[in-house]
Amino acid sequence: MTQVSGASDVPSMGRRQFMNLLTFGSVTGVALGALYPVVNYFIPPSSGGSGGGVAAKDALGNDVVLSKFLADHNVGDRTLVQGLKGDPTYLVVESSEAIGDYGINAVCTHLGCVVPWNASENKFKCPCHGSQYDATGKVVRGPAPLSLALAHVSVTDDKVFLSPWTETDFRTGDNPWWA
């Protein structure tokens, strides 16, 4: 018959070893928590679906619904939405039933200011240094060296999506500088 002894074969963890393990776990948790935003910065945002692009967001962060958007805006309006990489992007209302198949990035190519649409002059005018762009975002007056970037606009299930523009720039006939 086997005799049961009072001593265990597994040594108990000492206080020092327990405190070292606790300290290591705490430091590791804090380090991982601090590194999470850094790692997240280098991972591009998801495309938001099956190749449809990134959903355009309004000023409140809600998805842009085409039917409501068209009801609230007039033909010829250029309205800011949150687009690719979170950049402000103009959607162009072409008719009471449709928006343009392109969006215009609102970031000035000179120093990065957000360029407002000036409806009375039918052009974009940068408030920082006076650069001007026509209604399609093509630069017409410097100091901006390049036209505003473009994005493709598509509609799926009445929601507006933006995707990168990689084809020839229809305004200049050149390859896109932003791609």
Curated annotation (Swiss-Prot):
Name the domain of life.
Bacteria
Specify whether Translocase is a keyword of the entry: yes
Q: What EC number(s) does this enzyme carry?
A: 7.1.1.6
Q: What UniProt keywords apply to this chain's record, in alphabetical order?
A: 2Fe-2S, Disulfide bond, Electron transport, Iron, Iron-sulfur, Membrane, Metal-binding, Thylakoid, Translocase, Transmembrane, Transmembrane helix, Transport
On whether Transferase is a keyword of this UniProt record, the answer is no
Binding of [2Fe-2S] cluster, residues: C108, H110, C126, H129
GO CC annotations, alphabetized: plasma membrane-derived thylakoid membrane
What InterPro entries does this protein map onto? Answer: Cyt_b6_f_Rieske, Rieske_2Fe-2S, Rieske_2Fe-2S_sf, Rieske_Fe-S_prot, Rieske_Fe-S_prot_C
Q: Which residues cross the membrane?
A: 21-43
Q: Name one GO molecular function term.
A: plastoquinol--plastocyanin reductase activity
Please state the protein's primary subcellular location: membrane
Annotated coiled-coil segments of the chain? none
Annotated Rieske domain residues: 61-162
Instruction: Give the UniProt record's GO annotations in the biological process aspect.
Output: photosynthesis
Where, subcellularly, is it found?
Cellular thylakoid membrane
Disulfide bond annotation, renumbered to this chain: C113-C128
User: What's the subunit arrangement here?
Assistant: The 4 large subunits of the cytochrome b6-f complex are cytochrome b6, subunit IV (17 kDa polypeptide, PetD), cytochrome f and the Rieske protein, while the 4 small subunits are PetG, PetL, PetM and PetN. The complex functions as a dimer.
Matching NCBIfam families: Cytb6fFeSPetC, PRK13474.1
Q: What miscellaneous comment appears in this entry?
A: The Rieske iron-sulfur protein is a high potential 2Fe-2S protein.
Protein name stated in the entry? Cytochrome b6-f complex iron-sulfur subunit
